[in-house]
Amino acid sequence: SRTPILSVSNRWKDRKDQAEELLRDVEEMLRTLYLAHIGMLDAKHIVSYPEAWQRLTREADDAVFARLLDAVFEARRRRMNQVTWQAVIEGLLLHMTEEVQPWRR
């Protein structure tokens, strides 16, 4: 369902000045998950993440992480191309939701 995505994007649409900070935070989260995935970071560092993201970290292949990080890069590119911030954030959240969906139970 797109309802949670729209709810989050509505909260962020007026925070355009914090866009880069949000994208950095998402990128850092994904980097942390990837480092745990490849064994360079202990799993205790991701226990505060939702269970679906922890499962993705344990079970997904490397390509999932590449696609997620590419989505952050694409969000930055779209932002630079004058796409509305709300549309950028919706696209990123939609992509992240699709990637984590198989690990929800």
Question: What are the residue ranges of the model-derived segments?
Answer:
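AAA+ P-loop NTPase domains with strong preference for DNA replication initiators
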Residues: 1-105
